[in-house]
């Protein structure tokens, strides 16, 4: 991504433990690139990507990746592709 900072919002309908685990997996998978920040979704902030399992989500200018189930390797690969395409 050419040294450009990216912010990913994580918005899950599940509880804190699931959120913590998914955030940790994403961090391990993506944050070796120090330009990527992963945080709990805040509607007032701008994100380069929103990852959610909440089907009613729509914030027009933000790309959204919908999780169907738990976060798996296929999801991680697709998320990485979106970020670095």
Question: Model segments located where?
Answer:
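C-terminal structured domains
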Residues: 1-85
């Amino acid at each position: 991504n050419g040294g450009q900072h990216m912010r990913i919002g994580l918005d899950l309908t599940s509880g804190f433990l699931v959120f913590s685990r998914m955030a940790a997996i994403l961090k391990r998978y993506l944050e070796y690139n120090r330009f990527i920040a992963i945080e709990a979704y805040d509607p007032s902030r701008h994100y380069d990507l929103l990852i959610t399992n909440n089907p009613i989500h729509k914030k027009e200018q933000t790309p959204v990746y919908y999780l169907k189930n738990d976060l798996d390797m296929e999801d991680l690969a697709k998320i990485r592709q979106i970020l670095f395409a």
